[in-house]
Amino acid sequence: MAEKFDNLEDHLEKFVENIRQLGIIVSDFQPSSQAGLNQKLNFLVRGLQDIDKCRQQLHDITVPLEVFDYIDQGRNPQLYTKECLERALAKNEQVKGKIDTLKKFKSLLIQELSKVFPEDMAKYKAVRGEDHPPS
């Protein structure tokens, strides 16, 4: 899988470098540099074709649109992953707290119901296979 990305990365780096060189030629264009300009434009077209070939290998990869927003804002796209993980961790802690609270509530409820309805709770515990209330 990484090989696909490495291949795409190589093509993109070459493409960006070609655009940089093309910008230099265009910014100081001389009629004598027309041949070099044509050559760079041909390299540019071939680079786009190479990138398009990579697209076929990566058709099953999806990127969240928010990642592109990060890039457009000049932020590191890896921050998106970090922030997603932090949000997931916070949500997991919140859910764990709710689960712990419900377990405590169940334990207290069973204790109190055992005091008020000892026979019924004994039957309940027998059906559930519990000898004693969970802690």
UniProtKB/Swiss-Prot annotation:
It is found in: Nucleus. GO terms for biological process: regulation of transcription by RNA polymerase II. The keyword Ribosomal protein does not apply. Keywords: Activator, Nucleus, Transcription, Transcription regulation. Signal peptide: none annotated. GO terms for cellular component: mediator complex. It comes from the Eukaryota. Component of the Mediator complex, a coactivator involved in the regulated transcription of nearly all RNA polymerase II-dependent genes. Mediator functions as a bridge to convey information from gene-specific regulatory proteins to the basal RNA polymerase II transcription machinery. Mediator is recruited to promoters by direct interactions with regulatory proteins and serves as a scaffold for the assembly of a functional preinitiation complex with RNA polymerase II and the general transcription factors. Component of the Mediator complex. Belongs to the Mediator complex subunit 10 family. This is Mediator of RNA polymerase II transcription subunit 10. The gene is med10.
